[in-house]
Structure formats: C-alpha cells, structure tokens
From Swiss-Prot:
This is Epidermal growth factor receptor substrate 15. One of its GO terms (cellular component) is intracellular membrane-bounded organelle. It is found in: Cytoplasm; Cell membrane; Membrane, Clathrin-coated pit. Changing V154E: Loss of interaction with STON2 NPF motifs. The keyword Ubl conjugation applies. One of its GO terms (molecular function) is calcium ion binding. InterPro entries: EF-hand-dom_pair, EF_Hand_1_Ca_BS, EF_hand_dom, EH_dom, UIM_dom. It comes from Homo sapiens.
Length: 896
C-alpha cells in the first residue's frame, strides 16, 4: 500500500470526475469513510467474481480496519477497472492507463455488466430507432450501408473528442466491415447521445446494446451439451439438478488444470452465486476447461453474451435489477473450504518446487562455472600461442626499425642542412618581400590614379563611340553610291596617271611662285589639305597618330603627346618633307584656283582652325579635284627622301626650362667618353650617319648638311669638344612651341607630318620639295632590367606616355617622382633636379643595362607591335582609297 499511498487522488482518477461521482454514491453523508457493507454492495455491481473482489478489498484495506477512506476507495475503483480490462489485479497496475470502471445501473445500459441474456430487450427504444433511421436515410446509404466518410460529419457535429468518437465507431461497427447498417448506426447514435449526457462510453459493447440481429448463439454446441449432460447426471448423486463443489472437485482436479484457474471457472459459471452449478452451468464449465486443455484458450474475466447459459439469460436481468444492496464476499462456505485446501496444497507445492528449482539452479551454476573455466583455459592457451607469434613478428619488426632509424638519422642530417639553407633563403626572400611590399603600396597608389584616368577615358570613349555610330549612319547612304563609283574608278586609272605628270610639273612651278607657303608647326586645317594627293600617302603613314588624337582629349598638357607626328624615324629629311607637302598643296591650289564647283567634302570653316595667313593659298574656295590631276606626277620619283638631316633645323627644346640652364651638366667632366680626338677629326657626313647614337633602334640616320646643334642650349657648346654629337654650331630655336597640336573639331581631322626641328627659312627656295617617305612608328627604347621595370610602363597602351624623350620635367603625378629608381637616367646625376653640377663619376653608367634575355623579350614585343601597326596602316590605306574614290566620284558628278 506504500505505492498506493504515494499516488494522489488526481493520479488515481486520471482526472476523470466519474471516480468522484462513484464516491458520492457510497459516502452520501460525506463522512470521509466507506463501510465494508456499502463498499461490498457497490463493488458487486461491477460484475466481477467474488474472489477478485475479495483480492481488491484486501489490496485496498491493507490495515484491516474494515473501512475505506477516499483514497483507498479510489484504489479499489482503479483495481476494478484493471480487472474489467483484463489487467492483473495488483498495486503495480495502478500506474497503467485504463478507462474508468463500469458498474450496474438501471438508469443506463452502458453500465450493465457483460453478462446479459439473449432475451434482454434492446436498449435502443423504438421511438429513438425511428429517429436514427430517418438520419440514416438522409445520408443516402448504398445497399443499406453507410461508409465512414458519410458518418464522419454526423459524428463530428456532436463536438465530442476525437478519441471518444473513435471508440463509438469501433463499438458500433460490430461486424468490423468498415460500414454501418441501420442497427449499427442506431447503436452509434445512441452512444453519442449518452456521451453528450456525460455518461462514459464503455470499452466493450454491453449485451443490452447488441442489436438482436447481431446477437450470437450459445458457445456450447448441442453435441458437447449432450456429452456434458451425461457427466452431469453421473455427478449429481442427490438428483436435485445441481452439483456442489465437493461433487465436482475430483472431476475438475483430474483435468490437471491449476486450482486457481478451476476456481475462476467455477466463479464464472456460478452466475447466481449459490455455490452450485446447474446443468447448463456445468456444461459451460466443462466447455471452458476443454478450451484451455485443447486450444489453450484462457477463460475470460467476464462471460461474454454468447457464453451465458440460455437458462440464466431470462432471470439474470431480474437478479441484477432486484439485487440486494448488501452482499457477503464469503457466502459460499463450501467454496471457501475448497479454496483454502487448494491454497494450502498450492503453497506446499510451491515450496517443493522452489527447493527443487534452487537445487537445479545451483547445479546449473556449478556446471556453468566449470564450463567457463575450461573455456577460459582454452582461450588462454590460444592467446599464448598468438602472443608468441606476435613476439616473433615484433622482434623482426624491431630489427627493421633499427635499420630504418639509421637511415632516417642520415636523412635527418641532410634535411637539417637543407633547412639551414632554406632558412637563409627565406630570410633573403623576406627582405625582398619587404621591398616588394613597399613597391606594391606605391603601385597601388599609381593604380588608383590610373583607374581615375581610365574612367575619364572610358567616358570619352563612350562619347566617341556615339560619334562613330552617327558617322556610320551617315556612311550607309554613301556605300550604295560607292558601288556605283567603283565602276568609274576603273575608268579613272588612266586619267590619274596623266594627272600625276601634270602635278609634278605644276608643283615645281608653284613652289617658285609661292615660297612662303610652308606648314608651320603642323597647324593647318584639314579641309585645306584634304584635297592634296600627297595627303593620301601621309594619311596611311600616320594612322597611329590619328587614332591617338581620336582617343585623347583635344588639348593635352604635353605638346609632344598631342601630336602623333613628333616621333618619326630619324631617316627622313624634315626640310624635304615640309617642302614636299607644301609643293603639293600649292600645286593643287593653283590648278583649282579658278574652279567654281563646290567641294562636297568641304567643312564649315567655323568648326576648324584658321588657315595659314597667305593670300596665295586659297584652301576654301575651289574643288581640288577639278581642273588638275593630283596623281599625274610621282612625288617620290625625283627626290631622295633620305637626303636630309633631321637635326639640321632649329632646336625645339630651347624653350624648355631644363635646357636653359646656365651650367653645363657635363662641363665638370675632365674627359668626354664620347668625344673624338678633336673637332676637326670628323671624317665625313656618311660616317656620322652610321655613328649616330640617337638614331631610334640603331637605324641609319640621314646625313645633315647643316652644322647647327639642336642640343647646344642644353649641354653647351664646349661639353663634347669635337667629335661625337657636336651640335655647338646649331642655331637657337625660335620661341614658338614646336609641339603645339593642330587639332580641329571635325572628327575627320588629320594632322600632316611636319618637321619639328626645322626653321621656316632654312630650305632653299630654288630646290623643289619632295613628299616625305612612309615613316613607320619609331622603335621603342630598350626595356629596363627586370628588377627595375615599371609595371605602369609595361602595361601602358601608349608607349610614349611614360618614356617621352621630349618631356623634360614630368608633372607632380608622374611615375618618375613616385619611383625615381625605375625612371632614373643613366646620363644624369642624382642631383640634376636641384640644378647642381653633375657628378662625372655617374655619367654614362651602364651597370643597369638590360640583359640579353630582356633584349630578346623587348625585341619580340616590338615585332608584335610593329605588325599590329602595319595591319592598322593597311586598314587606313583602304579607308583612304575609299574616301578618294568617293571624292573622285563626287568631282565627276559636279563636273557633269
């Protein structure tokens, strides 16, 4: 009872108010205790046998007081519920979840015990049955049955818990076919209404609720009944129609079943609790015994409806209704005596069996111990053999490990030696890494500025792309006209040959008549020169400069960068180039001076720069293609374009502040490593052509017929003495900027090649000019050594932007200031920027000259770049031929 005392009333009742209701029925005076007579009368309504009820009473009244308090009465109710659900009647079953107990009550058929007669009236009244049938018909049954889907909404409308509705469905579906007929539906609705009236739903269907059509016959077959009747007649010696316990004791014990099971069968069959069995009850008892012996089926705790003898079905309901409220648990004295004897025999039997079991367990234990010891000895022997084999293997492995140890020690020495070398290498690499990190920080700053410049250029590129798109739109109507003009071009070929001869003749005559019509600084209008036939050849040679003008802003900070013609190869005589261009312009102007047709390619002068102030040059009045043949004469057939000296003109660096220094940075040098024996030792002009160190890429420079030194303003007249690069006799440059860009707002502007080193009056007027030869892009200078290369310089798309020989002082954001080591000049002292005298020891320091591999790499890049430029020039030549053809076609149209 200690376990029961620990349980509270809520735990015992599982929160069900039915337990409290039952207690109020017994303890009507609310005294807090229940007498034995009241408890016996109430517990008899459960329908359990007296033996089970007596056991329940003993478990509930552990103190033997003869009364029960509220908690003890709840324990008794809980044990009754366990017995009704087939569980063991013990205190350990109190913790199991069971439905509330069921007791007989005339007011509710749900609380009637499982024992019921076949003749019992159906609990569903006729008027209720009619109402339930109407609901059944409204649900449209199929073949007299309703499926669960149709019954489910009706049950859910009751608002009952789902578990209660599930139990109602299981109880009403008697044949378990998943559907309900009329009688089963009536049972379901009856249970729902009872549940709505707060009556508990039973765990099993009471016999009174079983429809008459579903009730079964008696379990004892007629053949068995006849056989058991013969045994009954032999046993009933007094011939009173009943047999007592003493009369059937020997027959029951001969079956070999336990006495407790026989007593349970006796209590089930003695439905009237009179201590005797009738003929039908005796047949039922033997039927239960035979079921246990043959099929092993245990007798139920409560008789099912089909087990109740037919003779007892009619009188059972009357006995239940009219039963006395007071009952005695030991009413049958003979049964008690028999039970006591059975208990004594069972106790003695249990003691003997216990002793025998203990001895058998001892024997088994000893045998098991011996067997375990034998197994252990066998295992140890096996383990010993394994260990010996392992010992041999380990010894062999140990010998191998000793050899490996010696080898590893030698390898360790070598590895340590290598580690020392690697550590030394790592230290040197760390030092180099530190220097590289500092350079990287510098490069990152330069990269940020370069990105800003890139964004600006990208914006300008977008604007230029829009202009190109608009130009393409204007070009589309001309393409159709070009197809028509190509046929005319073939007919013009012969005419062009005649015009070339006439052009050469006119150019010589016009040169004499217009000696002052030369180009100054290349600042002339594109429209005034576009009609010249010599311009077509120049356009092809300066396609790179034209592309640079289109991709960069019109006004540049450095004059050298704004003009793509400032870096031609030194092999061209600038005076001859200038005079040739001027001659072509003059000849075309004279031939077309009186033409009255309008030039279709003429651009409004308001969008261009002003022409050269010469009254003889009329660039805007006539069509250059009318009246003369620009291809009549060959401008390259008579004059050698390589006959002039590109350095014979004026000094273009005289206006720079760097070249106006009063001191000579090379004057302090005692000896000039580049000077000859004396000034008079210059052998010939041809020798100087081959020895010119300033010729780009080592190409041959045309000999100069002038004695002027364009570098005299920078290095002085006495720095080199006589011999190599003596430019002391060169004249001073004019104050005009020779690198001024000649740009125009027109997209098709082209800058004509001009000699930036030439003064305006150097060339003789009598000498006829010649057109300049095709000038390639100047060879780029040799790259710096690998350790001193500039990333910006190598990655820059403009090869002249960072290595411009004509830019004396870079700006504040120049890479030279950010990394002076990369951009150092081997010919300049470290203190040049402070205008101090140069250190002679640092002059011409070639210690940092690139290696042969760098020279090969540089030559490879130069070769690739020149190939790209050659292809670009070919494309430009094709474009110019197209434009020339269009111009010729337009001129033919205008003449017509």
């Amino acid at each position: 009872m200690a376990a029961a005392a620990q349980l509270s009333l809520t735990q015992l009742s599982s929160g069900n108010p039915v337990y409290e209701k039952y207690y109020r029925q017994v303890d009507t005076g609310n005294t807090g205790r229940v007498l034995a007579s009241d408890a016996a009368a109430f517990l008899k309504k459960s329908g359990l046998p007296d033996l089970i009820l007596g056991k329940i009473w003993d478990l509930a009244d552990t103190d033997g007081k003869g009364i029960l308090n509220k908690q003890e009465f709840f324990v008794a109710l809980r044990l009754v519920a366990c017995a009704q659900n087939g569980l063991e009647v013990s205190l350990s079953s109190l913790n199991l979840a069971v439905p509330p107990p069921r007791f007989h009550d005339t007011s509710s058929p749900l609380l009637i015990s499982g024992t019921s007669a076949a003749e019992l009236p159906w609990a569903v009244k006729p008027e209720d049955k009619a109402k339930y049938d109407a609901i059944f018909d409204s649900l449209s049954p199929v073949n007299g049955f309703l499926s669960g889907d149709k019954v489910k909404p009706v049950l859910l409308n009751s608002k009952l818990p789902v578990d209660i509705l599930g139990r109602v469905w299981e109880l009403s579906d008697i044949d378990h076919d998943g559907m309900l007929d009329r009688d089963e539906f009536a049972v379901a609705m009856f249970l729902v209404y009872c549940a709505l009236e707060k009556e508990p739903v039973p765990m099993s269907l009471p016999p009174a609720l079983v429809p008459p059509s579903k009730r079964k016959t008696w379990v004892v077959s007629p053949a068995e009944k006849a056989k058991y009747d013969e045994i009954f007649l032999k046993t009933d010696k007094d011939m009173d129609g009943f047999v007592s316990g003493l009369e059937v004791r020997e027959i029951f014990l001969k079956t070999g079943l336990p006495s407790t099971l026989l007593a349970h069968i006796w209590s089930l069959c003695d439905t009237k609790d009179c201590g005797k069995l009738s003929k039908d009850q005796f047949a039922l008892a033997f039927h239960l015994i035979s079921q246990k012996l043959i099929k092993g089926i245990d007798p139920p705790h409560v008789l099912t409806p089909e087990m109740i003898p037919p003779s007892d079905r009619a009188s059972l309901q009357k006995n239940i209704i009219g039963s006395s409220p007071v009952a005695d648990f030991s009413a049958i004295k003979e049964l008690d005596t028999l039970n006591n004897e059975i208990v004594d025999l069972q106790r003695e039997k249990n003691n003997v069996e216990q002793d025998l079991k203990e001895k058998e367990d001892t024997i088994k234990q000893r045998t098991s111990e011996v067997q375990d010891l034998q197994d252990e000895v066998q295992r140890e022997n096996t383990n010993l053999q394994k260990l010996q084999a392992q010992k041999q293997q380990v010894q062999e492995l140990l010998d191998e490990l000793d050899e490996q140890k010696a080898q590893l020690e030698e390898q360790l020495k070598e590895v340590r030696k290598k580690c020392a070398e690697e550590a030394q290498l790592i230290s040197s690499l760390k030092a180099e890494l530190t220097s590289q990190e500092s350079q990287i920080s510098t490069y990152e700053e330069e990269l940020a500025k370069a990105r800003e410049e890139l964004s600006r250029l990208q914006q300008e590129t977008a604007e230029l792309e829009e202009s190109v798109e608009s130009g393409k739109a204007q070009l589309e109507p001309l393409q159709q006209h070009l197809q028509d003009s190509q046929q005319e071009i073939s007919s013009m070929q012969m005419k062009l040959m005649e015009m070339k001869d006439l052009e050469n003749h006119n150019s010589q005559l016009n040169w004499c008549s217009s000696p002052h019509s030369i180009l100054v600084n290349g600042a002339t209008d594109y429209c005034s020169l576009s009609t010249s036939s010599s311009e077509t050849a120049n356009l092809n040679e300066h396609v790179e400069g034209q592309s640079n003008l289109e991709s960069e802003p019109i006004h540049q900070e450095s004059p050298a960068r704004s003009s793509p013609e400032l870096l031609p190869s030194g092999v061209t005589d600038e005076n001859e180039v200038t005079t040739a261009v001027t001659e072509k312009v003059c000849s075309e102007l004279d031939n077309n001076r009186h033409s009255k047709e309008e030039d279709p390619f003429n651009v409004d002068s308001s969008s261009l720069t002003g022409p050269v102030a010469d009254t003889n040059l009329d660039f805007f009045q006539s069509d250059p293609f009318v009246g003369s043949d620009p291809f009549k004469d060959d401008p390259f057939g008579k004059i050698d374009p390589f006959g002039g000296d590109p350095f014979k003109g004026s000094d273009p660096f005289a206006s720079d502040c760097f070249f106006r220094q009063s001191t000579d940075p090379f004057a302090t040098s005692s000896t000039d490593p580049f000077s000859a024996a004396n000034n008079s030792s210059i052998t010939s002009v041809e020798t100087l052509k081959h020895n010119d160190p300033f010729a780009p890429g080592g190409t041959v420079v045309a000999a100069s017929d002038s004695a002027t030194d364009p570098f005299a303003s920078v290095f002085g007249n006495e720095s080199f003495g006589g011999g190599f690069a003596d430019f002391s006799t060169l004249s001073k440059v004019n104050n005009e900027d020779p690198f001024r860009s000649a740009t125009s707002s027109s997209v098709s502007n082209v800058v004509i090649t001009k000699n930036v080193f030439e003064e305006t009056s150097v060339k003789s007027e009598d000498e006829p000019p010649a057109l300049p030869p095709k000038i390639g892009t100047p060879t780029r200078p040799c790259p710096l050594p690998p350790g001193k290369r500039s990333i910006n310089k190598l990655d820059s798309p403009d090869p002249f932007k960072l290595n411009d020989p004509f830019q004396p002082f870079p700006g504040n954001d120049s890479p030279k200031e950010k990394d002076p080591e990369i951009f150092c000049d081997p010919f300049t002292s470290a203190t040049t920027t402070t205008n101090k005298e140069a250190d002679p020891s640092n002059f011409a320091n070639f210690s940092a000259y690139p290696s042969e591999e760098d020279m090969i790499e540089w030559a490879k890049r130069e070769s690739e770049r020149e190939e790209e430029q050659r292809l670009a020039r070919l494309n430009q030549q094709e474009q110019e031929d197209l434009e020339l053809a269009i111009a010729l076609s337009k001129s033919e149209i205008s003449e017509a």
